Amino acid sequence: MVANVCEEAIGLKVQLPIQRMTYAEAMDRFGSDKPDTRFGFELVDVSEVVANCGFGVFTGALENGGSVRGINIKGQAEMPRKKIDALVEFAKGYGAKGLAYLSVMPDGTYKSSFAKFMTEEELQALVSAMGGEAGD
């Protein structure tokens, strides 16, 4: 009924059925109880990939029963440091201690806050688990 009203009143075609998900699914996939699914920024659990790496932030989180999750922001490998710092501050506003980032540069090298603590194989496994490629 609401879909018909929208179409009749303002010409907006509502695609049915409307996607629904449980609170638990929303929190697990997007980290929010009101996710914006338009952009595909789903959390990827990489806990198994980083479980034995030398980066204390990751291993500490796992030892305390937490998880390590990431978001692949396609095509943003060359995001300016100022913007990354703004994202860190945004995350801190929601209770995070910080953010770790890994960019795969167009030439295949890595720009990261933690790459020096991981082997090349671990970094490749992490990029693969995240569905990353050069430029991400």
Predicted regions and their residues:
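Class II aminoacyl-tRNA synthetase catalytic cores and aaRS-like
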Residues: 1-136
